[in-house]
Amino acid sequence: FLQFLHCPKSLWLLKRKPTLYEHGPFSNYLQKIITEGYEIEEHLKVFLSSQADGHKYSFQTVFKSSNGLFAIADCTRKNDDGSIDICEVKSSTSVQRGSPQNQIKDASFQRFAAEAAGFKVAGVFIVHLNSQYARDGVIDSNELLVFSDVTAEVDELIDETQQEIAAALLLLGTLDI
C-alpha cells in the first residue's frame, strides 16, 4: 500500500509484470531497519510475557479480505468484547507521520484491511523505542518500549485511506498503463 502511495506505477509493475520489475539493491540501511524491527518485536514479546494479560496478544496476525486486501499486523491484542487492538512495531523513537515512512497511513491501511477481513478494531498503537531510555546493563523491555495510541489519527484518515485503496485496486486491475 505504501508503495502505491509513493509510486503507483511501480506497484503495478511489481504485481502485473514482476519479471520486468527491478527490485534494486538491498542496502545495508534497509537490512539494518529490518533487523532492528525484529529485535524490537522480540523485546515486545518479553515485555508482554511479563504482563497479566500477555496471553491475549498474538504476533504476525494476517488480515485477508475477499476483495484482495492483505496485511500482516506485527501484534494484535484480543479484547474481552471480541474486538482487537492492532500494534505496529517500529524501531523509531517516535511516531513517524511524514513521507516516506508515514506510520499512521500504514496503520490506517492495516485497520481497513482488518475490518474488511471481518475483525472489529478497537484501537491502533505504534510501539516504538523510548527516546529517554538509557541502557544500563541488561535491556529492560518495560522501559524500552512506548505504546503510542494513534487510534484517533487513524480514524481521521480512514476515509482517505479507503479512497486510496480503491484507487490502488482499480490500478492493479488495469491490464496496461
What is each stretch, according to the model?
Residues 162-177:
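Polybasic (Lys/Arg-rich)
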Residues 40, 71, 157, 161-164:
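Alpha-helical packing segments of well-folded alpha/beta enzyme cores
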Residues 1-84:
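Metal-dependent nuclease catalytic cores that hydrolyze phosphodiester bonds in DNA/RNA
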